[in-house]
Each structure stands twice: as structure tokens, then as C-alpha cells.
Amino acid sequence: MAELMLLTQATPFNAVARVYAPRYRQITLSTYALDAQAQQAPLNLAYADVLAAFRHYATHYNQGRPFFLVGHSQGTNHAQRLLLEAIQGTPMEDLLVAAYLPGQPIPRAFFRDDLIRLPPCERPSQGGCVAFWHTFGEGAQPEEIAQWRQDN
């Protein structure tokens, strides 16, 4: 399954960058049905793998080069935390070209209150920012995503 994910999700970056894709213990889909407190232990376990992989990359492979951070779905959640805990306010922040994080909503409050140095991307030429999006099937009502209402 990991090979399929790399082929379908990481291949577009092969022409412009070296791809470093960590293997990590992912939570199961049923974990999302648990209450927030019950989700924490499995999410923390998965994130610990992601954090260890990023630190290994930063120490052994980055060598001062610019990088993109890419995550999808569950990886988007881990990448948000990684941006906050291991990139923002560190020398790696200056090397971040952009973070591409599709597949999960990111509340405006996250940028306003937590990730204050890495804003949402607003234009294609912007760097040091976070691009995120959702795709929707026909008949969906994306305007109902609460995180992007004006009062959030």
C-alpha cells in the first residue's frame, strides 16, 4: 500500500525535488469515530513517527536546502503539528518553500492563534506559506465547512 501511495501522491514532485516519504504508524479510520480524548494516544503515536522521521531528514539529508512539506488527509493533521512544533521558529522555517496540505480543513484560528509565522498561501508566487484545499463531489455543499465561516 505504501508503494501505491508514493506512486499516486508523491510522484508529481519527482521532477522538481528529492522525495523523502517516511513510513509511519497511521491510525485506523475507526479511530476518528472516537471522542477527542480517546484519539490522542493513537494520534500521538503516529505523530511521534512523523516527528522522528522529520528530525532524521533535517539532520542527515536536508543539508540547508529549501524543502516542501506535503501531507494528505491524516498526514495533513500530522504536518500541521510538525509546522507548529518543529518548523515554526526554527532554522527550518527559513528553508520551507511551502506546505501543501490537502484533505483536511484547517481552521482560520490555527493561523491566527498558533501558526502565526506561516500564513495561508494567497498567491502562486508566495513562499513560506501553507496551501490547503478540499475536493468535493457533485451536490456537496462546501460552504458548510464550519472552520471557514466568518465567525471562526
Task: Give the residues covered by each predicted segment.
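Gly/Ala-rich beta-loop-alpha elbow adjacent to hydrolase catalytic centers
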Residues: 71-79
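Surface cap/lid and interfacial helix-loop subdomains adjacent to catalytic sites
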Residues: 52-63, 84-152
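Active-site catalytic motif of lipid deacylating hydrolases and related acyltransferases
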Residues: 1-66
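Active-site-proximal beta-strand/loop segments in catalytic clefts of secreted hydrolases
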Residues: 23-27, 72-73, 101-105, 136
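Hydrophobic/aromatic beta-strand patches that form the interior of the parallel beta-sheet core
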Residues: 18-23, 68, 97-100, 131
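Short catalytic/ligand-binding loop motif for oxyanion handling, primarily in non-cytosolic enzymes
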Residues: 28-32, 77-78, 109
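Short amphipathic alpha-helical patches
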Residues: 32-36, 81, 106
